[in-house]
């Protein structure tokens, strides 16, 4: 059975490397998230056809909405930090890979865990600040 993966931070170095592995292993991409690199995110959308994407930065989310408008099979667009957390918790994904830089990734990690998703961490802050 093909695992469905959500990659948070898909436009960063770790995120793009993760997508290289996903591509080679024939995993399915359920969701992608970026802070503001809409150009790369949209290229990833064209290749991986995710069900949903999240863009944290407001201006970048507006640009993504314009670019996605009228696109056949366009993914659902979530916005802001809340959108990132919603994507992390969304049903349909088997694994959430968190490659978000810094403390910004903690809330998304917690959302994924609370919703029962398997979490792959490339975000040490989630361990350092979220642990006891």
Residue ranges of predicted features:
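N-terminal glycine-/serine-/threonine-rich beta1-alpha1-beta2 phosphate-ribose binding loop
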Residues: 1-103
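Short beta->alpha connector loops at strand-helix junctions that form conserved
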Residues: 56-57, 122-124
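A short hydrophobic/small-residue beta-strand
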Residues: 118-119
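Rossmann-fold NAD(P)-binding glycine/threonine-rich loop
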Residues: 64, 103-115, 124-132
């Amino acid at each position: 059975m093909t695992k469905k993966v959500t990659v948070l931070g898909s436009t960063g170095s770790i995120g793009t490397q993760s997508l290289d592995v996903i591509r080679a292993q024939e995993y399915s991409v359920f969701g992608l998230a970026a802070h503001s690199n809409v150009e790369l995110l949209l290229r990833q959308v064209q290749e991986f056809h995710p069900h949903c994407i999240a863009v944290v930065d407001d201006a970048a989310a507006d640009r993504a909405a314009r670019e996605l408008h009228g696109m056949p099979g366009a993914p659902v667009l979530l916005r802001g930090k809340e959108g990132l957390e919603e994507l992390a918790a969304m049903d349909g994904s088997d694994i959430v890979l968190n490659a978000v830089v810094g403390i910004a990734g903690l809330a998304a990690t917690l959302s994924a865990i609370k919703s029962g998703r398997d979490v792959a961490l490339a975000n040490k802050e989630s361990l350092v600040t979220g642990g006891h």
